């Protein structure tokens, strides 16, 4: 077991200030669920990985219920490269043939998930890994990708799914027993196939079904940026639609922002896009009043 974080070098008055600032937020979120989409640099840099593990443990210790949905794009790309296969994306979604799906399952449900679970447990937490196939968690259907160049037509991108339904029973059971669920975004279809589902979409749907108080989506940029590279700290549904139209939001940000907006419209009270490259970004967003990232609003 790793030694706990050494706070001896922090002056007592500063410790008191930190705790005093956090206390109202601890009270506000006590007993509430926070869904965190975990990805990007925060999953690959050791310092950030350790900081994230400690953050979610602290949340659990103060009575907040974190639920983690993780990505793993770089790890999947690396595994595909080993077998001589290139990754292909359309509108931010990975084209997933049968061979790619096999790689996705063992990378996300094995290597990536277990790395997260082991790190949380190493620092004294109690995490349990799941895929959407466990406990009937995520029912999926094949995603029909609209062809933007041919209205009314669709592009076949293989075993890529969208969430048809979520059965949260297994997640709630783990929460009740003081575990931290770590979920790989793989669903199962009525056709018996596994489906690769964008982790942002899973996080948004799960936050809605769990009646989460907050949804955090970690990324490798400060938040949503305008065309001049300036951070947009607060976005309404109308403003987001305009950014979609003019191409400011594109590529991998499309499913992320769409999912965030859907969650906000579905009743998730607080939805934020945060910079996962900043150490302890989860705690900074939840337990301080420091403006951070981009807030997504439904109105």
Swiss-Prot record:
MF GO annotations: acetylglutamate kinase activity; ATP binding
Say what the protein does. Answer: Catalyzes the ATP-dependent phosphorylation of N-acetyl-L-glutamate.
- The protein here is known as Acetylglutamate kinase
Compartments, record wording:
Cytoplasm
Originating gene: argB
State which Enzyme Commission number(s) the record gives.
Answer: 2.7.2.8
Stored Pfam families: AA_kinase
Against HAMAP family, the record matches this protein to: ArgB (MF_00082)
**CDD domains per record:** AAK_NAGK-C
NCBIfam families, per database record: argB
Question: What would be one Gene Ontology cellular-component term for the protein?
Answer: cytoplasm
Source organism: Burkholderia vietnamiensis (strain G4 / LMG 22486)
Please indicate which residues carry the site annotation Transition state stabilizer. Answer: 37, 256
Signal peptide residue numbers: none
Record key words, sorted: Amino-acid biosynthesis, Arginine biosynthesis, ATP-binding, Cytoplasm, Kinase, Nucleotide-binding, Transferase
């Amino acid at each position: 077991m790793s030694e706990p974080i050494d706070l001896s070098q922090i002056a007592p008055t500063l410790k008191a200030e930190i705790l005093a600032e956090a206390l109202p937020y601890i009270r506000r979120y006590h007993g509430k669920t926070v869904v965190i989409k975990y990805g990007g640099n925060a999953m690959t840099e050791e310092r950030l990985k350790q900081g994230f593990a400690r953050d979610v443990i602290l949340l659990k210790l103060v009575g907040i219920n974190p639920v983690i949905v993780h990505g793993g794009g770089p790890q999947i790309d690396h595994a595909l490269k080993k077998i001589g296969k290139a990754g292909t994306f359309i509108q931010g979604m990975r084209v997933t043939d049968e061979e790619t799906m096999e790689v996705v399952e063992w990378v996300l449900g094995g290597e990536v998930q277990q790395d997260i679970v082991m790190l949380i447990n190493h620092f004294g937490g109690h995490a349990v890994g799941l895929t959407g196939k466990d406990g009937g968690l995520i029912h999926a259907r094949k995603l029909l990708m609209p062809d933007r160049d041919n209205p009314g037509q669709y592009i076949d991108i293989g075993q890529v799914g969208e969430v048809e339904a979520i059965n949260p029973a297994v997640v709630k059971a783990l929460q009740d027993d003081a575990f931290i669920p770590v979920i790989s975004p793989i669903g199962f279809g009525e056709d018996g196939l596994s489906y690769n589902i964008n982790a942002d979409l899973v996080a948004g749907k799960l936050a809605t079904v769990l009646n989460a108080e907050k949804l955090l989506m970690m990324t490798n940029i400060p938040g949503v940026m305008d065309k001049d590279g300036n951070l947009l700290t607060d976005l309404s549904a109308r403003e987001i639609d305009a950014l979609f139209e003019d191409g400011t939001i594109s590529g991998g940000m499309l499913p992320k922002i769409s999912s965030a907006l859907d969650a906000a419209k579905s009743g998730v009270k607080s939805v934020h896009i945060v910079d996962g490259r900043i150490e302890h970004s989860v705690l900074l967003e939840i337990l301080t009043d420091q403006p951070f990232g981009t807030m997504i609003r439904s109105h």
